[in-house]
Amino acid sequence: MKEYRFRYGDGEVVIPLDEGQVLGELHGNHVPAAASIPDTLRAALENPIGLPPLRQWTKPGERVALVVSDMSRFWMRQDKVIPPLVDYLRDECGIPEDHVTIIVANGTHDGGDEKELRTLVTDGVYDRVRVVNHDCLAKDLVYVGTTAHDTAVWINAQAPHADRVICLGACP
């Protein structure tokens, strides 16, 4: 019997399998951790691949919406990325913190409560920046068109009020 352990929420799920049922295991390539997430993020914002630095895309005083994954994608560690990004927007781009709205992209999941939102964006950011849960059933969603497959696209009502929309995310 072999046990497979998966992080889930604040805990883990253990799945015991008879070794005869296991056809193989797929492991990702090891990627060393960044020495400093804020420094690595700053370098990426200053030197994005094929684009000018973020500070050249923005103007002081603009409104910015940050769209971030919900707690179901917390393995992306938004809590490590959002604080230095908000600081960069303030310090390098001249975007006041009261001009930043974080939209938590919940998909069809229920929105997080205050504790989850504070975990996601950190207490420091939660106390300084507006954080809202996206609700896919909200009556004020804004229609923006259709996809190539004729699927209607509706977005959070906060996004059209922003001069810039920055989406953070990762693929599982």
Question: Predicted segments — roles?
Answer:
Residues 74-95:
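Histidine-anchored nucleotide/phosphate-binding helix
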Residues 66, 102-104, 167:
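Structural beta-sheet core signal
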